Amino acid sequence: WVFHLNSGSCNGCEIEIVATLMPRYDPERFGIKLVGSPKHADVILVTGPVTKKMADRVKRTYEQVPDPKVVMCIGTCGESGGVFYDSYSLAGPIDDVIPVDVYVSGCPPRPEAIIHGVVKALAKLERLEAAP
């Protein structure tokens, strides 16, 4: 199950995430289902660069997800700050705040890329669950 967290994006990635959830792509066949609470999630989808105001919230959200967990960085802004990289209000890319397991590049990434990333994240989650 997947929890989405916007850490300061322009909403381009969110539009593509919504497109990914449409019947055309049917992500539930892969076990992809959005949940409203990080306490019920296995995977965190984080979009956007982390603003200074969101840095603590991102950390708290990460801590609320039960182990094992996988973090996905969706979009170029989350990877490097994107067009906002030199903004005074940024804490930095996502991996400066929490560990990231899967990166999905693009501005914004296509739904197919997001699905591919989630499938990779679920495979990693299965490996983590199988580990002693």
Walk through the language-model features, giving the residues of each.
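Iron-sulfur-associated redox domains of electron-transfer enzymes in respiratory
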Residues: W1-P132
